[in-house]
């Protein structure tokens, strides 16, 4: 068993928390068994003084079974 790490950017129009969830959900689409997430950075787009898009740069760790059956 190896653990691999992927860097992703999650986005949300609601919150940074939802941006992190978005990144995790996207990573899970590949069938990866996610074991953890590390938030590296938060940013936001601002228009007319309001935050309109939240972004979270994350590292997602997942199990790599190298062709072995998952249990």
Predicted regions, residues:
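Short, well-ordered alpha-helical segments
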Residues: 1-37
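A cross-kingdom feature marking charged/low-complexity
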Residues: 42-71
